[in-house]
């Protein structure tokens, strides 16, 4: 039976759904971390009503915690939402890990830079990291000028590079379809339901993601990740995550890299955990965890 808890920091509390492990051998807890503009709903169920990854991995023997970033989903938003940083989310995740004990972190998209940083800063509380089309740490992102005027007219695959710092960022349906509902395996019949789950984002987080003014979240000591099982999982219909880019991320981290076409799986875009073969992908991740003794 699904329950919930509130965790996080005093400044940035977070809500997490808790899907308890099914009876049987117990494994490490899993914390599932969504990306920008999203919340944890996509790990609980798909927008077209199929079972999500959280209950799937609970059957494998994991207590699963699906966290909403501060100010997202059911996590309270503070008056400083426009100043919410990736490190703020990371510290909230670190507090949740103190509640769960050492856990495997699944991180999607913009959750990636947060997860890599948390693995470095809270090393004893992270048993492994599974990156799902994950963003890189700022070590791999060239710093862009801090002045907004320097980015006038610039875009990153369809949206402005710079987000005005004085107001939350929103996206429209065209953006949602181009950026996230872009793979041939996305459940297009449920696009409306999916679009209704998308909320505003902190402009600071977006600017950190593009390393505006060198503000991105960096790793300070990769040696702290040595020996940590890490996986980067990427599909072939995610134009902002080409094989070369995510392969370079995996190499930088010392992670395993699973380019899905290399095992005969094609058509996956950005939203791997809700696409029509999400059970197959979950099984691949479970197999990798098994290989790590997790």
Please report, for each region that a protein language model flagged, where it lies by residue.
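Conserved hydrolase catalytic core segment
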Residues: 102-140
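Catalytic histidine-centered segment of alpha/beta-hydrolase-like enzymes
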Residues: 263-278
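Alpha/beta-hydrolase
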Residues: 146-245, 255-259
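Short beta-to-alpha linker loops that shape the active-site pocket of alpha/beta-hydrolase fold enzymes
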Residues: 36, 63, 68-73, 135, ...
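Short, surface-exposed "cap/lid" segments of acyl-processing enzymes
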Residues: 24-26, 30-62, 66
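Conserved acidic catalytic loop of the alpha/beta-hydrolase fold
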Residues: 87-103
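N-terminal cap/lid segment of alpha/beta-hydrolase-fold proteins
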Residues: 1-24
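Glycine-rich "HGGG/HGxG" loop immediately N-terminal to the catalytic nucleophile
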Residues: 67-83, 266-267
């Amino acid at each position: 039976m699904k329950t919930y808890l509130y965790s996080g920091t005093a400044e940035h509390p977070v809500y997490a759904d808790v899907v308890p492990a099914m009876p049987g051998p117990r494994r490490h807890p899993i914390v599932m971390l969504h990306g920008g503009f999203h919340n944890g709903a996509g790990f609980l169920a798909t927008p077209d009503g199929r079972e999500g990854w959280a209950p799937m991995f609970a059957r494998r023997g994991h207590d699963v915690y699906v966290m909403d970033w501060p100010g997202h989903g059911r996590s309270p938003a503070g008056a400083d939402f426009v100043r919410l940083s990736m490190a703020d989310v990371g510290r909230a995740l670190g507090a949740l890990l103190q509640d769960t004990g050492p856990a495997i972190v699944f991180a999607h998209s913009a959750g990636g830079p947060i997860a890599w940083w948390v693995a470095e800063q809270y090393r004893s509380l992270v048993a492994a990291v599974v990156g799902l089309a994950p963003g890189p740490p700022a070590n791999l992102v060239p710093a862009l000028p801090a002045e907004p005027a320097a980015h006038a007219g610039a875009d990153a695959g369809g949206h402005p590079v710079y987000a005005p710092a004085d107001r939350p960022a929103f996206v429209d349906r065209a953006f949602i379809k181009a950026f996230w509902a872009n793979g041939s395996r996305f459940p297009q019949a449920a696009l409306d339901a999916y679009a209704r789950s998308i909320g505003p984002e902190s402009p600071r987080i977006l600017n950190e993601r593009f390393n505006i003014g060198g503000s991105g979240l960096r790793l300070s000591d990769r040696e702290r990740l040595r020996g940590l099982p890490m996986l980067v999982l990427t599909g072939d219909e995610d134009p902002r995550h080409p094989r070369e880019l995510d392969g370079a991320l995996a190499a930088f981290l010392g992670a395993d890299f699973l380019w899905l076409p290399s095992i005969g799986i094609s058509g996956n875009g950005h939203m791997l955990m809700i696409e029509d073969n999400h059970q197959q992908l979950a099984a691949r991740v479970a197999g990798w965890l098994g290989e790590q003794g997790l």
